[in-house]
């Protein structure tokens, strides 16, 4: 799963920023992008001068504190890490059903996503390679990414960090978000 690790994605992003002529920059990310941004700040501290993460707690903490509420709310974390081709086969059988179910689970109002945006998600999730890549991202999170995080225990980010979360979101209700991020950042 190494090619789908947050470290590999961070390296790709760093290469893009270097190619664009940016040796230092701010980065912000939400959800999976927040996890990549966190890894980018860890692996390239000379480049990332400010970090913002939205609606996430540190990955290892989320796995380490899993309970029934978390497992129910984030069931896809545990479904998508199952060995291939199990989740890929189930999703590809009816990608529209999978996406509609996820959108309903994640949001209170289906109108929050436009029909055009949903159609683009469906177009992408009708491609077996996209489904596999999505599963591999989660498999990496539950394996090699946790190894990378474990190697960083005790090493705190020393850059300005902005953490934002929704008042009614699962992570905001389950975790003391400021305390959670103080464990990994100054």
Question: What does each model-found stretch correspond to?
Answer:
Residues 2-28, 35-186:
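Flexible "cap/lid" subdomain of the alpha/beta-hydrolase fold that forms the substrate-access gate
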């Amino acid at each position: 799963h190494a090619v789908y690790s947050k470290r590999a994605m961070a390296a790709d992003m760093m290469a893009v920023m270097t190619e664009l002529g940016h040796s230092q920059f701010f980065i912000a990310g939400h959800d999976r992008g927040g996890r990549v941004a966190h890894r980018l700040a860890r692996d390239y501290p000379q480049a990332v001068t400010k970090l913002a993460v939205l609606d996430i707690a540190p990955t290892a903490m989320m796995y380490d504190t899993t309970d029934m509420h978390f497992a129910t709310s984030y069931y896809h974390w545990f479904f998508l890490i199952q060995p291939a081709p199990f989740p890929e086969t189930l999703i590809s059988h009816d990608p529209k059903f999978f996406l509609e179910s996820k959108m309903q689970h994640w949001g209170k109002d289906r109108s929050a996503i436009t029909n055009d945006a949903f159609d683009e998600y469906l177009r992408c999730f009708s491609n077996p390679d996209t489904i596999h890549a999505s599963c591999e991202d989660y498999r990496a999170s539950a394996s090699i990414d946790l190894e990378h995080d474990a190697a960083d225990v005790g090493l705190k980010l020393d850059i300005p960090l902005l953490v934002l979360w929704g008042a009614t979101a699962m992570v905001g209700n389950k975790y003391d978000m400021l305390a959670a991020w103080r464990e990994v950042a100054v």
